[in-house]
Each structure stands twice: as structure tokens, then as C-alpha cells.
């Protein structure tokens, strides 16, 4: 009888293990290119950015899905940094080589080079088969691509991305930028739910620059997003690291990760606290069809 009991326990344990699925997502902050960086990367034949990622490439590549905020355009020459960013194509090649899987393009610099910058960036990303979300050539393009659904390791992750503004520049017809608009976001969340995702993650370009604490508007919007059905929130824009929190859901056992700002990842900013940022790992576990946050952690860079 004891042997039979042990066999049953082993079988139950084995079945439970086989029913478990896990995925690790890695989020980083702003991928930027200022004039000094562009100059430093210049070689006789072009640009070389391998040094930017050589110490963290392994960690990025180990994640099942690595996501970063592309806060430049790839608008072609002349290459420039602040205030109107256009980075060399080699910067994107290095980002892909470092192991990034998805890039966010909804930020206040996505229209720095106007229609050409938005469309050339999208074309180059597509040519490298690099999924991105937040900016679109046309409304039809947005309808086909958004929300971005990522499928890996048996998981379906719906990724949303929005920006507070584009530095006063309006998108040229027929280009589309995802702005923070609760009416539109609510509609997008409903579309995301129809995709039957295991998790909905909202990436928000929000808040006030250089402030180490989140603004009340960020907190209010985070509360609203969770109430609407978003599972986790990743923030950018302030260029400094802001607090992170794990919030227990009020209605069921789920927990929600809220990162108000990851700060800078690659940049040449020199203001206080802008010379680095955070990488956040989010591990999800699915058991018997139910997805929960297994763990989360961060490292400063």
C-alpha cells in the first residue's frame, strides 16, 4: 500500500510539472543616441556599437523575450542626437545582435524626423523581422499589428504601448502614434482580451523627466489600467529610475508588477541619476491554464 501511495504521488508530481509552463520577460529602459555616442561609435566604414552591449549581452539573450524602448528614430542621415534624434542603422543592428526581441516605438521622440523618420524606422525594423509596437504607417497597419501578440513557450502575451506626447509634433497623415487616451486604451484592452492572452502588459511613456518619484497622474493611470484588466505595467520617459511595486489583485490571487520608470539604458545624459537605469525580469508561470506572476527582480546598470 505504501508503494502504491508513493507511485501515485510521483505520478501527480510528474503530471503537475508537465502542466507547468514558464516564461521570462526582460524589460530595459531608454535606448538613446546622443551626439557624443554617435561620434564615439564611428569607424572608417560606418558605426560599431558592440561595446555598448558586450557586458550585458548574455543576460539579455537569456531572457525568453527582451523588450526595450527605442527612443530614437532611424530616419537616415544626417545622424543627430538631442533634440531631434536620428541614429545610424548600425545601432539597431547592435540592439538585435544583443538579443532584443521586441522594441517599443511610442515615445516623445518617435516623430523627431517626421513622416520619413517614422516610416523608415518601421521599414528597417520590419526588414530585420524585429517586432515593434506603438507607431504605424497607416490605420490599417495599426489594425493588423495592434495589440502586439507575442507567442512563445506556450504563452500568449498582449503588449500595449502609449506615449504622453510627441514634443508637440503631430503625425503626418496617414501615420499613427499611440497616445495616452483612456477611451482608446479601453478599446484596445477589449481587443487584447479577444486574443485570449495569458497576460496583458502595458508599456507607458509617461511622467515627468528627472523626477525620482512617480507623478500623481502616473499612479492614477496605473490604478485605472489595472482596473481595466492590464496585468503588468512598465514605464519609461523620466530618464531616471522610479519606484516599482507588486500589487495584490483585489478580486483574485493574481499579483501585478508596476514599474513607474526604468530610467536610461543606453544614453549619454549627464544630469543627476540619468547615467543608468534598471533591467527588470518578470517570470510568469502557467499551471492548468492559469497564468500568475511567479517572480520579479531587477538589476541596476
Could you tell me what each predicted segment is?
Residues 1-20:
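Bacterial Sec-dependent N-terminal signal peptides
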Amino acid at each position: 500500500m505504501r508503494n502504491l501511495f508513493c507511485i501515485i504521488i510521483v505520478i501527480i508530481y510528474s503530471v503537475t510539472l508537465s502542466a507547468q509552463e514558464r516564461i521570462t520577460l526582460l524589460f530595459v529602459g531608454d535606448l538613446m543616441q546622443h551626439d557624443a555616442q554617435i561620434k564615439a561609435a564611428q569607424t572608417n566604414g560606418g558605426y560599431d556599437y558592440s561595446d555598448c552591449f558586450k557586458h550585458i549581452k548574455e543576460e539579455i539573450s537569456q531572457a525568453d523575450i527582451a523588450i526595450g524602448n527605442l527612443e530614437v528614430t532611424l530616419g537616415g542621415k544626417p545622424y543627430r542626437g538631442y533634440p531631434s534624434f536620428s541614429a545610424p542603422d548600425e545601432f539597431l543592428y547592435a540592439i538585435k545582435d544583443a538579443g532584443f526581441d521586441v522594441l517599443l516605438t511610442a515615445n516623445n521622440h518617435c516623430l523627431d524626423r517626421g513622416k520619413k523618420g517614422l516610416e523608415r524606422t518601421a521599414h528597417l525594423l520590419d526588414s530585420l523581422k524585429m517586432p515593434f509596437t506603438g507607431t504605424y504607417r497607416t490605420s490599417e497597419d495599426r489594425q493588423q499589428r495592434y495589440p502586439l501578440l507575442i507567442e512563445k513557450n506556450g504563452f500568449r502575451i498582449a503588449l500595449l504601448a502609449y506615449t504622453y506626447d510627441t514634443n508637440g509634433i503631430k503625425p503626418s497623415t496617414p501615420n499613427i502614434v499611440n497616445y495616452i487616451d483612456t477611451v482608446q486604451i479601453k478599446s484596445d484592452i477589449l481587443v487584447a482580451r479577444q486574443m485570449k492572452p495569458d497576460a496583458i502588459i502595458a508599456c507607458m511613456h509617461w511622467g515627468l523627466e528627472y523626477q525620482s518619484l512617480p507623478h500623481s497622474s502616473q499612479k492614477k493611470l496605473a490604478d485605472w489600467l489595472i482596473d481595466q484588466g492590464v496585468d503588468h505595467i512598465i514605464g519609461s520617459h523620466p530618464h531616471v529610475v522610479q519606484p516599482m511595486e507588486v500589487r495584490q489583485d483585489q478580486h483574485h490571487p493574481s499579483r501585478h508588477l508596476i514599474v513607474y520608470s526604468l530610467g536610461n539604458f543606453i544614453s549619454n545624459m549627464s544630469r543627476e541619476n540619468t547615467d543608468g537605469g534598471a533591467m527588470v525580469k518578470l517570470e510568469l508561470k502557467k499551471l492548468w491554464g492559469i497564468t500568475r506572476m511567479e517572480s520579479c527582480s531587477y538589476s541596476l546598470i
